[in-house]
Amino acid sequence: MSQSASMSCCPGAANGSLGRSDGVPRMSAKDLFEQRKKYSNSNVIMHETSQYHVQHLATFIMDKSEAIASVDDAIRKLVQLSSKEKVWAQEVLLQVNDKSLRLLDVESQEELENFPLPTVQHSQTVLNQLRYPSVLLLVCQDSDQNKPDIHFFHCDEVEAELVQEDIESALADYRLGKKMRPQTLKGHQEKIRQRQSILPPPQSPAPIPFQRQPGDSPQAKNRVGLPLPVPFSEPGYRRRESQDEEPRAVLAQRIEKETQILNCTLDDIEWFVARLQKAAEAFKQLNQRKKGKKKNKKGPAEGVLTLRARPPSEGEFVDCFQKTKLAINLLAKLQKHIQNPSAAELVHFLFGPLDLIINTCGSPDIARSVSSPLLSTDAVSFLRGHLVPKEMTLWESLGETWMRPRSEWPREPQVPLYVPKFRSGWEPPLDVLQEAPWEVEGLASVPSDQLTPKNRLSVRHSPKHSLSSESQAPEDIAPPGSSPHANRGYQPTPAMTKYVKILYDFTARNANELSVLKDEVLEVLEDGRQWWKLRNRSGQAGYVPCNILAEARQEDVGAPLEQSGQKYWGPASPTHKLPPIFAGNKEELIHHMDEVNDELMKKISHIKTQPQRNFRVERSQPVHLPLTFESGPDEVRAWLEAKAFSARIVENLGILTGPQLFSLNKEELKKVCGEEGSRVYSQLTVQKAFLEKQQSGSELEKLMSKIRRAEDSYTSQHTSPESEGAPHL
């Protein structure tokens, strides 16, 4: 009977003893030194024992009834399975000594298979015939077996030719009684040492899933194609409180990033489902091999099948459920922008595997325990509008962590931000995953008698509650016992006073965000999420990411905001009840509002006739040390010192020029700077964006100046002496 295993079609690498679905060596985004350490630990030669990291692809029984009468037949079958993406690569360690070949579990080092040298009948390499370029083939037959097994291994770190030479030298020594193998191992050891010293850096881990051609795999239909172009008339697919919308290019870039995240998420879900299916298949094959056996002794190939049949851990199930929820959120967000397949088609692709995974778990309990990420209101509405009855029943069985949108979720305890880890090693940009303030749908409804003064302030300033149409009396938002105008003065309730100190510079990227400088102290208007709304001393307000904030101490707040023991708070809008005379009378209300508007217009006209008052606001002058693409090492060093990086970082990076520093990616900076590498990369990204914005602004000014000159030239040429300044029509 044929024994084979299959593989997921998604790219990537697995961790530990998990299967791998491609022929690419596992090159994660980790440190180069970690790669070398892993390589040296997996591929070793000591005395007469050698060890190689390989991937078990398949095991076939040489059986004419299975159309496998020879080694060539087995190779053809493997090529056929590989072309249909039905090969599942399982990481193992292949150990060769003077008595046997052993297969070990990568994680536990447990022995999976033991092939005594007399049972190894044949070995050969299969090069460049599959998507796996370097394959080792072994034919083994135990004394208890009627038919031999043919095993295939992908040699992903040491070439198959070297491994085969090692095995053949061990077989020759065993059969002929010679000692030729030590010399072979000596040459191999030198080659492995050379390879370790020149091990290449990791390839770029960021996949571009939507560039896959539709015919590449049977599962290509479950991948999102290129995003639809952003219509000129569409202001953006995010709800915003500001009238300033994202530029079309920025919006298109964001949609592209989110499409990429969606495709990576679908890849990982698909890989997990394929792994479950292959585990079930391996379990079935294992039982068939054990059938009819009188001895309890482990038979040939049963060790690898046992490893393949091992179910995923609970943590891996949780990870898959989290990615399913993330995919649902992204489908709802991108439903107007993706095609071939559409979001409505992909949601059915998600719920089919979800049903299989929950059945594998035995109950929906694990799925119910997964709260992060919460579904958005749009996602919940999207599911209600597209699920068929069977899928709706499954969804409802998962409970409120799947059905209750984040806008209705309690503020405390706060559900953490979900940052997925993909098998490919690609790290999604945090700015895409982090909820921007205009995407947050507000807080859960809390009874008014449970609102503390602090909570009341947060609710009041929440964008989604500022224009509430609910039957909540406006004055109920104010602290108990206060008058409607109690918050207009300069002495607010102590619980309302909160200041934070800025740890790093932050440059606003749109009208909703606020640019801040390191060590600046700002007043908190809204908190509790990834973005906090702050107000600076100049009265400007906007959103700032909370990971660059620290609680301000009393001495940090300083005198300007605390003169005479009084803390300044901007006047809040007065609250008024609707006069009873207008309640329920729409026409009267409109007439009243017209009168109010007329009154306001008169006041505004009167104000315009008054002498203009020039208010001058003192601002702290930031220390600005430019870093450009023309900067030399001295300017780079000064910029690093101004950003308060450690002396080691200044010493290591201060020898570079501006272009050299800008050319380093995040992983390269981490290798040089350690933990501070991420912050260096973040500061460089902000600086690069500032330079690009500055350059685009100057280019725009040149273009506008050129247009004005052209218009002036045209006007002067077409202006008559009698009507100077008026162009002829």
Curated annotation (Swiss-Prot):
Biased composition annotated in UniProt, kind: Basic and acidic residues: 236-247, 699-712
Sites bearing Phosphoserine, chain numbering: 242, 573
Main localization of the protein described in the UniProt heading: cytoplasm
Biased composition (Polar residues): 713-722
Disulphide-bridged cysteine pairs: none
Residue intervals of the SH3 domain: 495-554
Cellular component GO terms held in the UniProt record: centrosome; cytosol; protein-containing complex; ruffle; ruffle membrane; stereocilium bundle; stereocilium tip
GO biological process: positive regulation of ruffle assembly; Rac protein signal transduction; regulation of Rho protein signal transduction; Rho protein signal transduction; sensory perception of sound
Name by which UniProt lists this protein: Epidermal growth factor receptor kinase substrate 8-like protein 2
UniProt organism field: Mus musculus (Mouse)
